[in-house]
């Protein structure tokens, strides 16, 4: 894994240095394999003058310290306007339409593997780019497949399904072959200051702020009723955009007379009436679906699964694989029938398909299929 391969010598790799442990170790491993490595730090969000929610300055400092330790150059680039136009505006539009988007997927598509790759190509003359994502690449019959990362708990293929096989072919994913614990061990052994740095969680542009506070600065909230699935009004919500299907916490519903002790879940967002519909129990019938329709399809190899294929999918990150059968309603709409009913499938999120270890691609969940 870390021995020099003569075919790598002279090949230039630009590593996306985030200031975290995964990109730090990626740069180190690629150097050990004989590549000519340089780092590139992206700034994707302009923080407020007073509150640096994304901690970009700290991350840049850590990235620079790692590059200094490894003896490699660190370049910087500002993609804030591209991020605003292609990721953030999409994020707001989806919330406004009552759906729950995944900005990380759009960031990978538009920024990390598009704007970054173009900059690395045109300005830095790269042969490859590399990221600290937990996925693997396999080259077979002239195309590059994307496989799940070895560490099943950290596998990030769900967030990368929009990549083309051409983008995968230009990308290296060194830590995808390792467990997270091994990555931290390597960083510690090499004396990299990021070895015990906490993994970033949540959405970069929100940072430590409360999600509701952040969203309300961009979209006006429209309070409305909370109703049971039987139509009884039992409370008020501050805005449908703050809630997602299957949500249990933060509903503000106390104990009600003549109701069981089972927790309440969001089972529907009625956009026409501006009503949040709730039901009791994680297996509430209104929470379950037997399948879905997805559109905005993207296949890593451009072909996609065959009509009638029995494969698996994930409708959210870290979900267990769901066995399913797929058929096509059109070139850009896939019909998915689950082997067993699934709870809290959410329009606006991504359905990502797998054939064993191979990430095939996916699409955006549009409509739920219920009996």
From Swiss-Prot:
Its EC number is 2.8.1.13. The keyword Signal does not apply. Residues 102-104 are annotated as: Interaction with target base in tRNA. GO terms for cellular component: cytoplasm. CDD domains: MnmA_TRMU-like (cd01998). One of its GO terms (biological process) is tRNA wobble position uridine thiolation. Keywords: ATP-binding, Cytoplasm, Disulfide bond, Nucleotide-binding, RNA-binding, Transferase, tRNA processing, tRNA-binding. It is found in: Cytoplasm. ATP binds at residues 16-23, 42, 132. The active site is at 107 (nucleophile), 204 (cysteine persulfide intermediate). The record marks 133, 349 as: Interaction with tRNA. It comes from the Bacteria. Signal peptide: none annotated. InterPro entries: MnmA-like, MnmA-like_C, MnmA-like_central, MnmA-like_central_sf, Rossmann-like_a/b/a_fold. The keyword tRNA processing applies. Disulfide bonds join 107-204. Catalyzes the 2-thiolation of uridine at the wobble position (U34) of tRNA, leading to the formation of s(2)U34. This is tRNA-specific 2-thiouridylase MnmA. It comes from Shewanella piezotolerans (strain WP3 / JCM 13877). The gene is mnmA.
